[in-house]
Amino acid sequence: MQRPWAEPYKIKAVEPIRMTTREYREQAIREAGYNTFLLRSEDVYIDLLTDSGTNAMSDRQWGALMMGDEAYAGARSFFRLEEAVREIYGFKYVVPTHQGRGAEHLISRILIKPGDYIPGNMYFTTTRTHQELQGGTFVDVIIDEAHDPQANHPFKGNVDIAKFEALIDRVGADKIPYINVALTVNMAGGQPVSMANLREVRKVCDRHGIRMWSDATRAVENAYFIKEREEGYQDKPVREILKEMMSYFDGCTMSGKKDCLVNIGGFLAMNEEWILQKAREQVVIFEGMPTYGGLAGRDMEAIAQGIYEMVDDDYIAHRIHQVRYLGEQLLEAGIPIVQPIGGHAVFLDARAFLPHIPQDQFPAQALAAALYVDSGVRAMERGIVSAGRNPQTGEHNYPKLELVRLTIPRRVYTDRHMDVVAYSVKHLWKERDTIRGLRMVYEPPTLRFFTARFEPIS
């Protein structure tokens, strides 16, 4: 018999949550325009909207807050953050930002010119928006398996080398400032990239003089999957695997609100001094001094401490297995989800869950709203609403994946919470024919999934 195992932490403080009535939730989602982003948090029972900034900090991180140096310039907290990034990630230079999209903004302004092409292993909403705002065009070069929810490829986040080289041949290397490799790939279901693939991408970049950049937001989760699935890494600590992964990149954007186990903050890291200088010039305009980048000293201290905690092997094993615990319950019930189960979330396949709802009636949005009404569980749409519109034609982008993301915050919920979520999803699966599509009644010009409003189609 296998010995059971438990969370590698004790709980020191708790926050009460409350279950509401179905009638209350029906009114709440109606007032929110059937957009789970617009719900009030006190009306949510279990919040699986995102793992961004929703983590529980450790006692050492809370203690680190008291060590924050709030000097306007040259704060020692910045140098502690810089030291942590250099030691764990291996990059020479660091510029703090208020969160990940601050770093995306900086690197997009520095490297992208109008008419450039930025290949990547599937789009991410804010990343692509920053690229387009600078006149660039995102090009998806992920392997085909990533677009099939049922394809059980161990590294569905891999770059398709043939697609990457075909783009270079078509537009020329001088039109490609960098390739952006996400670790893991959020929009594909939290899927990892193999170390072998990173090496191959690096070879192509070196051959053509193209920079290799990483969205390292969930790189620790990626490192754990390499440890599990890639030959030669089973006996290596996650900390060592992460360092090797980052060694193939020229720099990274980072949202500390995920891997780093904090509620706010991010950074831009790089090896080229001229990019550092440009980033410092830009960060003063948009974020703050180069030694705080829109963050309080105490937040930089918490990020630095979190960087050391995130590479603890026991912690990251628990993190991945809690997500897997939820996903395996759904698979056993025959519910369609993205496979293999990802690192930060379980993704429901809304196309297969609600085949009677056409994509232009927003099935993932409808399913997320129905889940909230059923149980008070808040999830996130990751389908046509998130994909937005083509900036040239104004038409909807129709992604192959139409997903609902059940995102697990780090060190926040227990497996009993996962049981509640699984029960609700299984109940909806039985009642799926009763769920109706939606029409969009308000649409903002960019990043519409945050604030768009909907109503049911009768």
Swiss-Prot record:
CDD domains: Tnase_like. One of its GO terms (biological process) is tyrosine metabolic process. Keywords: Lyase, Pyridoxal phosphate. The keyword Lyase applies. Its cofactor is pyridoxal 5'-phosphate. Belongs to the beta-eliminating lyase family. This is Tyrosine phenol-lyase. It comes from Symbiobacterium sp. (strain SC-1). The gene is tpl.
